[in-house]
Regions:
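Acetyl-CoA-dependent GNAT
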Residues: 37-95, 111, 115, 163-165
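Active-site acidic-Proline motif in GNAT/NAT acetyltransferases
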Residues: 92-98, 128-129
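Conserved acetyl-CoA pyrophosphate-binding loop and the N-cap/start of the following alpha-helix
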Residues: 95, 99-108
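Conserved beta-strand-loop-alpha-helix junction that forms the acyl-donor binding cleft
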Residues: 122-134, 150-155
């Protein structure tokens, strides 16, 4: 069973996150700070994600759990008052392609809609070459909304979910 829980300020959570960043396929898409380095220092993971856990006002990190075991990461952040961006990945090849990511995204969409009823739009912007992720996001209900170029010059696909009525 797939569930979500807030990422915790524990060595176990930071270590799990670091281990996923070392996985080559995942690292290709998500760890941009030291993408060309052979290692991802645990201290760097703790610094970057610790701030998000200890001061959850801008970015809200969660773990994706399969039967209570961490298998992935999902976070949301406010781009504007009514617009939320998402980042997500599953940590190892063994858990990809099984529908877990789509289920986690559906749960996160519901969580955001419950916790933040003013939100009108959710978006996610994977690299345009990350076909597996794009398939997952479409399966979860996200719809194509065009292409953008990220700050590193990479072509990304913009996918969105819009809420027609306020949640109230």
């Amino acid at each position: 069973m797939i569930t979500l829980r807030p990422m915790q300020d524990t060595l176990a959570d930071y270590t799990a996150l670091r281990s996923w960043f070392l996985e080559p396929e995942l690292r290709r898409w998500v760890w941009c700070d030291e993408k060309d380095e052979p290692d991802v220092p645990l201290a760097r993971v703790m610094e970057k994600y610790g701030q998000r856990i200890k001061h959850p006002k801008d970015v809200f990190p969660y773990f994706v759990l399969l039967n209570d075991n961490p298998i992935g990461f999902i976070q949301y952040y406010f781009a504007e008052e009514t617009i939320v961006g998402l980042d997500m990945w599953l940590g190892t090849p063994q858990v990809r392609g099984k529908g877990y990511g789509s289920e986690a995204l559906r749960q996160m969409v519901q969580l955001i809609h419950r916790k933040h009823p003013v939100v009108r739009e959710l978006f996610i912007d994977p690299d345009a070459e990350n076909h597996r992720a794009i398939h997952c996001y479409r399966k979860a209900g996200f719809q194509d909304a065009g292409e953008i170029t990220d700050e590193d010059g990479n072509r990304c696909l913009l996918l969105k979910i819009c809420f027609d009525q306020p949640n109230g």
